[in-house]
C-alpha cells in the first residue's frame, strides 16, 4: 500500500461538483491535515476552532492552500492535470488544463494570483498565472543546469520574478529567463515577495541574517533587517506591506519588523513554528501544522502581536442507541 495518505474527494474529469460543507460564521482561513483533509478555521483570533472537513470525493496526494485562502491547488495520483479546489461554500474541485508529471513544492505569490509548482519528474518549475479564474501556464523553468536540491520557492504577483532556494544557493530568475545568483544568501530558511512588488524578504540560515532585497531580478539592493536570527523557518509580510515577520523553529520567537523604520518587536510561542501561512486579516498567520495536535496562530492585528492555539479537531461521533 502506498505510504501516501489519500483523502477521498469526489471528482470527474472535465466537471466540477459542489459538496456540502455546512460552513457558517466567521472563517479565519483553511488548513490541510493529511489525516482529515481541508478544514476551515472558524471564529476569530483567540476564540477559534477547527471545523468539519470539506467533503469532496477523489484521491489526492498533495494540497496547497492559496495565501488568500479562497482556493487550493491539488495533485491527484489518478490524474495528470493540476486540480483547483474552490473553498467557497459550497466547495468544488475541477481540473486545470495544466499537466504535471510529479509534484514537489507548490508556492503562491502574496496575493495568490500566481503559483509555482515543482514538477519533479520533468525537473521543471511551472509558473501559473491568472489564478484562480483564468489559470494559464505562463512559464516553465528548466532546472537541469542547477545543482543542489530545491527546498523553497517564492514568486511575485506579476509572475515576473521567481526566487529558487536550493540546498546550497539561492537564485533569482526573471520572466525573460535571466538568472541572477543571490550571492549573499547561502541557504534560505524562508523567503517571500512583498505584495505587488519585485522586492523580497529572505532569511539566511547560514548567516542567521534576514535581508530585504530590492528589485531581485535587476540591480538588486540588499539591506539587513535582522543581524542575528537563528534557525529562521518562515517569513511573511502583512497585506499592507508595512511589516515583515520572521519565525524561528529553534526558539519559538517571531520577530515583527517595521519596514519603514526598521524597528523590531517580538512575540513568543511555546511551539516550534514551521510556517507563516497567511489567514484572513492584515497580519494573521498560522505557525504550525495540525498533525492531530493543537494549531498555533499569530495575531499581528492586535495592539501587540500575540500567539494563541486552536484546539485539535475532534470528529463528531454518533452514539449507537442502547438496545
Whereabouts are the PLM-identified features?
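Short loop/turn segments that connect beta-strands within beta-propeller blades
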Residues: 44-46, 86-90, 129-133, 174-178, ...
Amino acid at each position: 500500500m502506498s505510504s501516501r495518505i489519500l483523502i477521498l474527494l469526489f471528482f470527474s474529469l472535465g466537471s466540477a461538483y459542489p459538496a456540502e460543507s455546512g460552513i457558517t460564521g466567521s472563517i479565519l482561513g483553511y488548513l490541510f491535515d493529511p489525516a482529515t483533509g481541508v478544514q476551515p478555521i472558524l471564529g476569530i483570533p483567540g476564540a477559534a476552532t477547527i471545523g468539519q472537513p470539506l467533503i469532496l470525493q477523489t484521491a489526492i496526494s498533495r494540497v496547497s492552500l492559496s495565501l488568500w485562502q479562497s482556493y487550493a491547488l491539488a495533485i491527484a495520483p489518478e490524474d495528470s492535470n493540476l486540480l483547483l479546489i474552490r473553498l467557497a461554500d459550497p466547495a468544488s474541485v475541477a481540473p486545470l488544463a495544466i499537466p504535471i508529471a510529479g509534484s514537489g513544492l507548490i508556492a503562491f505569490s502574496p496575493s495568490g494570483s500566481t503559483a509555482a509548482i515543482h514538477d519533479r519528474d520533468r525537473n521543471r518549475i511551472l509558473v501559473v498565472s491568472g489564478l484562480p479564474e483564468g489559470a494559464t501556464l505562463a512559464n516553465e523553468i528548466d532546472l537541469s543546469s542547477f545543482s543542489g536540491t530545491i527546498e523553497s520557492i517564492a514568486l511575485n504577483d506579476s509572475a515576473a520574478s521567481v526566487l529558487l532556494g536550493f540546498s546550497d544557493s539561492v537564485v533569482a530568475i526573471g520572466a525573460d529567463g535571466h538568472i541572477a545568483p543571490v550571492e549573499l544568501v547561502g541557504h534560505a530558511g524562508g523567503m517571500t515577495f512583498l505584495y505587488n512588488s519585485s522586492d523580497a524578504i529572505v532569511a539566511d540560515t547560514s548567516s542567521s541574517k534576514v535581508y530585504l532585497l530590492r528589485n531581485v531580478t535587476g540591480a538588486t539592493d540588499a539591506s539587513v533587517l535582522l543581524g542575528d536570527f537563528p534557525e529562521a523557518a518562515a517569513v511573511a509580510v502583512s497585506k499592507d506591506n508595512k511589516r515583515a515577520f520572521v519565525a524561528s523553529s529553534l526558539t519559538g520567537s517571531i520577530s515583527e519588523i517595521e519596514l519603514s523604520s526598521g524597528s523590531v518587536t517580538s512575540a513568543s510561542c511555546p511551539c516550534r513554528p514551521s510556517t507563516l501561512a497567511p489567514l484572513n486579516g492584515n497580519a494573521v498567520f498560522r505557525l504550525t501544522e495540525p498533525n492531530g495536535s493543537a494549531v498555533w496562530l499569530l495575531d499581528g492585528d492586535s495592539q501587540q502581536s500575540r500567539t494563541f492555539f486552536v484546539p485539535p479537531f475532534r470528529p463528531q461521533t454518533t452514539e449507537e442507541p442502547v438496545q
